[in-house]
């Protein structure tokens, strides 16, 4: 079961969107929300406020990508931030032994990788057009910001 819940910012004036409707979908997102809220260098941010249309090749149809975070720092630079496990930011590795379970897991990983890369290409393209920087934040980056959890 995924770790999720509602979250309320202390610095409501920094949040763009409805502060009563903020949902974290992982303990990593919750940590990053708290970091954004406390960090004086972040002047504005929102959770799932940027919606990016993309074509999902795995499903053969148009979809909408709800970016995890939009933020603006004190220099005025805007960022799209996607929070993902490092494992999902790299192409899957074919298992050495192709058991039924390993094949199924590998196929799921290929599907996830395909969907993610389609989303990230669309996000990067839109970001470049708007002068926004697109970043994928993994557990390594979160630890560098002070995350202590698993």
From Swiss-Prot:
Enzyme Commission no: 3.1.-.-
GO MF annotation: an example: exonuclease activity
Q: List keywords of the entry alphabetically.
A: Endonuclease, Exonuclease, Hydrolase, Nuclease
Q: So which domain of life are we looking at?
A: Viruses
Broadest EC class? hydrolase
Q: Which Pfam families match?
A: Tn7_TnsA-like_N
Q: Where is the active site?
A: 29, 68, 84
Instruction: Say what the protein does.
Output: During phage morphogenesis, plays an essential role in the head-tail joining step. The associated nuclease activity is essential for morphogenesis, possibly by cleaving packaged DNA to enable the joining of heads to tails. Displays both exo- and endonuclease activity.
Which protein family is it in?
Belongs to the Caudovirales head completion nuclease family.
Name of the featured protein:
Head completion nuclease
The UniProt gene name for this protein comes to 50
């Amino acid at each position: 079961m995924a770790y999720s819940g509602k979250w309320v910012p202390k610095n409501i004036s920094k949040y763009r969107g409805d502060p009563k409707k903020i949902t974290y979908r992982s303990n990593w997102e919750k940590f990053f929300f708290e970091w954004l809220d406390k960090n004086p260098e972040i002047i504005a941010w929102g959770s799932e406020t940027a919606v990016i249309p993309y074509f999902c090749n795995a499903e053969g149809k148009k979809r909408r990508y709800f970016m995890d975070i939009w933020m603006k720092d004190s220099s005025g630079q805007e960022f799209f931030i996607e929070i993902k496990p490092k494992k999902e930011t790299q192409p899957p590795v074919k298992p050495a032994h192709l058991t039924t379970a390993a094949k199924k897991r590998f196929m799921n990983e290929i599907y996830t990788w395909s969907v993610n890369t389609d989303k990230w290409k669309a996000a990067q393209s839109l970001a470049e057009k708007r002068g926004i920087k697109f970043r994928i934040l993994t557990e390594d980056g979160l630890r560098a910001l002070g995350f202590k959890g698993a």
